[in-house]
Amino acid sequence: MGKGSIAVVGGGLAGLMATLKIVEAGLSVDLFSLVPFKRSHSACAQGGINAALNTKGEGDSIDEHFDDTIYGGDFLANQPQVRAMCEAAPKIVNMFDRMGVMFNRTPEGLLDLRRFGGTQKRRTAFAGATTGQQLLYALDEQVRALEVEGKVRTYVGWEFVSTIIHNGVCCGITAQDLSSMEIRAFPADAVVIATGGCGAVFGKSTNSTINTGYAAARCYQQGALYANGEFIQIHPTAIPGFDKNRLMSESARGEGGRVWTYKDGKPWYFLEEKYPAYGNLVPRDIATREIFDVCVNQHLGINGQNVVYLDVSHIPAPVLNAKLEGILDIYQKFVGDDPRKVPMRVAPSVHYSMGGLWVGLDQQTNIPGLFAAGECDYTQHGANRLGANSLLSAVFAGMTAGPNAAAYAKGLPEDQNIPKSVYEAATAKDESDYRSILKLDGAENAYRLHQKMGELMTKNVTVVRNNADLAETLVKLEEIDERLSRIGVQDKATWSNANVPFIRQLYGMVDLAMVITKGALERNESRGSHFKPEFPDRNDEEWLKTTIARYDTASHSPVLSYEKVDTSLIAPRKRDYTKAH
């Protein structure tokens, strides 16, 4: 059985944190990443990390952080996991402080905090507007030190292909070197999947283009359960782009930025007018729906487009440069305007997946030996994630998955031995599948099919959903799934071939699109990011439950069931952000 090591797939915050904890527990790690760790999507998180540090003397507490998170997620998150995360948050921020992360500080030397959406307290520690990058770089340095000591073996530029499952237990992975195209089996006592979100399912999103969701999709295809797939966060303020959308952080509003458009020839600050208690810092699902209403229903978007203004030009330039320089420079680079002088034009965009692989309290999936951590799991955010809880949940999930994966590995029978033939068979199968894709010579273009799927999902399965469109989307996704077999591969090279991995990823993206769409179709209520005008209210009696998708190998379709939500710590109540809660 393995080598007394664990395979970690993903080099972002969750994967690196899990790696550190596994090595702390005395085991070695094989660490896989598509890109150099510092280029993982965690680097794109801008605004900060939440923790009830109370350095502002506002009386903030872990209890309030916990309540805000559960309330913001519309009570769909299992509460013990969220409570544990909020309790760990101050320790996590202090850990990064000791690692040398250059958090902004007050004149007194305390950690500075800013407000984020869905809160009444300043709770978000930040390093300018590049917080994710700074946290990622700190963990990268720690892992590099362990690599030098021989405790971590890194495989950068390798893509996860499949889990290896023997007698119902995960005992390793196969992965492909994207330069040589070699496929190898890697025995492991346990596997941690930490590969982020699935924004590419929607075509353009704020996610990095590597965020296809393939690893989670492949685990789902191999029997892992996928939970709450229908809950996709649409960020209210992104920079529209031809190639992809780019995030304009909530921190811009946290530092005093205002969202507005023209109405009757005058600036209209519609969020401040409708939600006086929270103003521009209402939760993201609410801000997005208000912007959608203003642009699509009231036709009040700027210059007739589906964009509004996000204005920070009234804030003194020295303050902007000290706290928001990173994101303002991004806007100036890609748009050409200086946001210090003119309002920014922003629009909602697919941003984050609250759903993901089903895991228990120990971050283990329903397949023994297979763990998941970070955005690719479903545990912390319910129906809507609060801003600045993403960095926290990624680190916390890695911090939980790592020790539990190590404990699982140590608990395996000493005489357990997986035959070499199991790994040889897994390698042979994935090699055969790779060769089969390489030989495809049909008339369909994989990139066109991906574009069609993305446009379909963005149109029908984002801000506003209705059952007729969702049913039609499912039919069209099934048509796309059928067309996959008729793809033609233009690049037949047997080295550095980007076409074949993309087609493999596309198979997974179509399956995840079906999970998301079917979950949305079946859930006849409105909750968090899931909004159906046909069913405008939250329905706890029928729908206070987690959606569980199981893959049907014959039809390639999800089979849905439901699981009770643990609401043992806070009784559900109606969300209302027109007043402080």
Where does each model-flagged region fall?
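Glycine- and aromatic-enriched mobile tails/lids
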Residues: 1-5, 21, 25, 36-38, ...
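Short beta-strand to alpha-helix junction loop
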Residues: 77-87, 125-140, 155, 205-213, ...
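N-terminal Rossmann-like FAD-binding beta1-loop-alpha1 element of flavoenzymes
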Residues: 5-31
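Conserved redox-cofactor binding core of oxidoreductases
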Residues: 92, 97-182, 187, 194, ...
